Structures are given as structure tokens and as C-alpha cells.
A protein has these predicted regions:
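Oxyanion-hole/transition-state-stabilizing segment in secreted/luminal serine hydrolases
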Residues: 38, 83-120, 138, 143-147
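Residue-level recognition of beta-strand->loop/alpha-helix junctions
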Residues: 74-76, 141-142, 191
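Serine-esterase "nucleophile elbow" of acetyl-processing enzymes
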Residues: 22-76, 90-97, 181
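Surface-exposed cleft-lining segments at the edges of enzyme active sites
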Residues: 46, 76-77, 81, 107-117, ...
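A short helix->loop->beta-strand "cap" motif at the edges of active sites that frequently abuts
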Residues: 132-137
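Histidine-centered active-site loop/cap adjacent to the catalytic His
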Residues: 64-65, 85, 100, 180, ...
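Substrate-gating cap/lid alpha-helix
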Residues: 147-192
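Single-pass alpha-helical membrane anchors
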Residues: 2-26
Length: 226
């Protein structure tokens, strides 16, 4: 009889320990997001040549989250590569603290002489910096360049004077995008956005409708975290 009581009590203690252990590790409610920073290039920028750009995804997100008390900042400029973004992210984080930082970068690197490895290394440095400041790093792969970048819309430039040269750079960007999930450590990877090629005029920049798709994709997660 005593032995039965002993086993019953022992079982109850064991169940209680398991319950509180599970509750401790899985029952915690995540801290709400109170501040977000977006860093990137022209796809992310909220101004161009000193003039505001209202159609890009950070502004769409800001218009929804700011009234809810969430601080939304942006460090982005057209034509900039990952080295510039890394430098300016460092400066921003010296005087500002964020709960979450989104990185959307690399296309200007891939359409220049910067290697895939160097661009990925810069993004990893951003991730490590963000984590050291107590924020959550998110790396955005971006639209699916394979389908979004309509080769008929890719225009040669003074630096890349042929269509074949532009297609080669497009393929380099696809390779860079595909490398992100395995190359970048310690960050949440945001998968490719399904934006049709009809939502771009130059095969690089999404139209306002395309920007809305990006914003809505990110807001789905953000809404659950505020």
C-alpha cells in the first residue's frame, strides 16, 4: 500500500515538473515588436534625390504600424551596395535601438564587380552586428529574379552595353539569391516574393502594386508580433 502511494506521488511530481518545464520554454509570450528598421537600396528607400517616395514597402508598413505605436525607420539609398549599407547600419545602431531589423540588399553588388562571396560576407556582418545590439535580424531574399526580371525589359547601360551582358548579371543575382539561405547564419530568412514580371517597368524595380505585395508579406508576420 505504501509502495503504491509512493509511486503515485512520484508520478505526480514527475508530471508537475514536465508541465512547468514545457510551460517555461514553450508557454512564454514573445515580447511585442516596438521598433523596426529597414536597410537596403532603391527598392527600400523612402526618398530619392531629397524627395519623398511614398510607394515603397517601408512607407506602406509605416502607415499601418506607426498609429499602433511601432517606430519604423529606414536606412536606404538608390544604387547603394552592401558595403555602404553595412557602414550606415553601424552608424544608425550607434544611437538607435530596434527590436527587429530587415536587410534587403545585394542587387547593386550583383550588377557591378562585387563578388557573390563579398556581398554575402557583408550581409553576414550586418546580421552579426544586429544581434550584438539585441535586435532580431531578418534577411529578405526579395522577388524571384528568375521570373520577375523580364529579359525584354532589361536595358543595357554604359557599363553593360549589351543585352547578353545584362542577362549574365541577372543570372549572377539569381545565384546570389539562392545562396542566401545556406550562407547566412543566425538570421530569419524571408523567402522570395511572388511578384509577376508585369509589375515592373525595368525588370529591377517593382511598381507600387509590387511594393504592396512585399509590404503585405512582411506585415503578415509583423501584425502577429505587435
Amino acid at each position: 500500500m505504501n509502495k503504491k502511494i509512493f509511486y503515485t506521488v512520484t508520478s505526480l511530481i514527475g508530471i508537475t515538473i514536465i508541465y512547468f518545464t514545457v510551460k517555461k520554454f514553450f508557454g512564454k509570450k514573445a515580447q511585442p515588436i516596438g521598433s523596426v528598421l529597414f536597410v537596403g537600396d532603391s527598392i527600400t528607400a523612402i526618398e530619392s534625390s531629397g524627395k519623398p517616395v511614398t510607394s515603397t514597402y517601408p512607407n506602406i508598413i509605416k502607415s499601418e504600424l506607426s498609429p499602433k505605436g511601432v517606430k519604423v525607420d529606414v536606412v536606404a539609398q538608390g544604387g547603394k551596395r552592401t558595403d555602404w549599407i553595412l557602414t550606415n547600419l553601424k552608424e544608425k545602431l550607434k544611437t538607435n535601438k530596434y527590436d527587429r531589423v530587415y536587410i534587403y540588399a545585394g542587387i547593386n553588388d550583383m550588377f557591378s564587380s562585387v563578388s557573390i562571396e563579398s556581398a554575402l560576407q557583408n550581409i553576414q556582418k550586418m546580421v552579426d552586428l544586429i544581434k550584438s545590439k539585441g535586435a532580431e535580424p531578418y534577411v529578405i531574399i526579395g522577388y524571384d529574379a528568375k521570373t520577375f526580371m523580364d529579359e525584354n525589359k532589361l536595358k543595357p547601360t554604359s557599363y553593360v552595353p549589351t543585352k547578353a551582358g545584362m542577362v549574365k548579371l541577372k543570372n549572377r543575382y539569381i545565384e546570389f539569391q539562392n545562396a542566401i539561405p545556406n550562407a547566412i547564419k543566425g538570421a530569419t530568412i524571408v523567402g522570395k516574393f511572388n511578384i509577376p514580371s508585369s509589375m515592373t517597368g525595368d525588370a529591377i524595380h517593382p511598381t507600387p502594386s509590387g511594393q504592396k505585395i512585399i509590404a503585405e508579406s512582411l506585415l503578415k508576420d509583423l501584425r502577429m508580433s505587435i
